[in-house]
A protein has these predicted regions:
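N-terminal amphipathic alpha-helix/helix-capping segment at the start of soluble metabolic enzymes
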Residues: 1-5, 116-127, 183-184, 190-191, ...
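Active-site mouth loops of central-metabolism enzymes
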Residues: 1-12, 54-59, 129-142, 195-200, ...
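Conserved, mostly hydrophobic/aromatic
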Residues: 5, 29, 77, 91, ...
Length: 294
C-alpha cells in the first residue's frame, strides 16, 4: 500500500512537509489547483528532494499538458475523466516514447537532465513513468472492460465524488450505488493485475478499501488537512482557561424530580442545546453563580 495527498498549494514548503512526514507520493493538482508550469516544476523539485514520488494530475486529456508535466520532471501523470478505450489509449500514447507511445521529444528539459542524460536511457525511461487513469462516471463504468484491456495503464484511480454525481447522488460517496460501482471497478481491475487507487478523507473508508485490495490511497488534501488542524487548534484555544465543567439542571417537571447533566462544551454550544429542549424550565449553574436563568 502507498499513501499520498493531493496538493493544492503553490508553495513547495507543503510538498516538503509531506516528504518529511514520510508519505510515498504527492499528487500535484492541476485540475483543481491554481498552478502555473513553473510553480509545478518547483513543487516537483521539492518532492524529489524529500523522497516523494511526484505525480501531476493534468486538467484534461491533452497531449501538450501530459508532455509538459513529464518534461518538468513528474514521474507520473494522472488523467481525469477517462470514459472509453480510445481516450485511455491516447493517455498512454501521450505519456510514453516509441515504441510505447508518441510523446513529444525534447532533451533539453529537467526530465532529460537538460541533455546530460544518455539519449537512449532517456527514451527507455518513459516506460517506467506511471500512467494513472481516473474513472469517475457512468460512461467509464459502461466501457470498463475495454478500458482495462488497454496496454500501458499502471493504475486505475476511482474518483468517488464525480462518480456520485454521475450516478445521481452528488456528494453521497457512501451511497450503495457509488460503493457497488467502485467495488465492481476494483474487482475487474484486480483480475487484469492493474493497481487500483482512490481518494478518501475518512479513516473508516481507508480500512474498507485496503481490505478490498485498493493499494494507491490518496488521503485528503494539503488545504483540507490544514483546515482540519487549524479548526481543532482554534477550538482548543477557546476552551483554554474556561471552567472544565458546566451543569444544567432540569426542572422537577422531569420524572426523576430533577437531573444534573455534566457538560464540557462552550456557552454557545449549551445555548444551542437549551433552545432544543422545549417545555422545560432550565437553570444554569456555574461555580459561584447560582440560578442564573438563561
Amino acid at each position: 500500500f502507498v499513501y499520498g495527498i493531493f496538493t493544492k498549494s503553490q508553495d513547495p514548503m507543503f510538498v516538503e512537509i509531506q516528504g518529511i512526514s514520510e508519505y510515498d507520493f504527492v499528487i500535484l493538482d492541476s485540475e483543481h489547483g491554481p498552478y502555473s508550469v513553473s510553480q509545478q516544476q518547483n513543487n516537483i523539485r521539492a518532492a524529489l528532494l524529500r523522497g516523494l514520488l511526484p505525480i501531476v494530475r493534468v486538467s484534461e486529456l491533452s497531449e501538450n499538458m501530459i508532455g509538459k508535466a513529464l518534461d518538468i520532471g513528474a514521474l507520473g501523470v494522472q488523467v481525469p475523466q477517462i470514459e472509453n478505450a480510445k481516450q485511455a489509449k491516447k493517455a498512454v500514447k501521450y505519456a510514453r516514447f516509441y515504441p510505447y507511445g508518441e510523446r513529444g521529444v525534447c532533451r533539453f528539459v529537467s526530465a532529460a537532465d537538460y541533455s546530460a542524460k544518455d539519449r537512449n536511457e532517456y527514451f527507455k525511461s518513459s516506460k517506467d513513468l506511471l500512467v494513472i487513469l481516473q474513472l469517475e462516471g457512468v460512461q467509464a463504468i459502461s466501457n470498463l472492460d475495454e478500458i482495462l484491456d488497454v496496454e500501458g495503464i499502471d493504475i486505475i484511480f476511482i474518483g468517488p465524488y464525480d462518480l456520485s454525481q454521475s450516478l445521481g447522488v452528488p456528494g453521497d460517496i457512501k451511497n450503495p450505488k457509488v460503493l457497488n460501482a467502485m467495488i465492481n471497478i476494483v474487482e475487474k481491475a484486480k483480475e487484469k493485475n492493474i493497481v487500483v487507487g482512490t481518494f478518501t478523507d475518512d479513516y473508516e473508508m481507508v480500512t474498507k478499501w485496503k481490505n478490498m485490495g485498493v493499494q494507491y490511497i490518496s488521503y485528503s488534501t494539503d488545504s483540507g488537512m490544514f483546515y482540519d488542524y487549524s479548526r481543532d487548534v482554534y477550538n482548543a484555544l477557546r476552551m483554554c482557561g474556561e471552567k472544565e465543567k458546566k451543569s444544567l439542571v432540569l426542572d422537577s417537571t422531569l420524572s426523576n424530580g430533577g437531573q444534573v447533566i455534566d457538560w464540557k462544551y462552550s456557552d454557545k454550544d449549551i445555548k444551542f442545546i437549551l433552545d432544543k429542549l422545549e417545555n422545560s424550565k432550565i437553570e444554569f449553574i456555574e461555580m459561584g453563580i447560582l440560578n442564573d436563568t438563561i
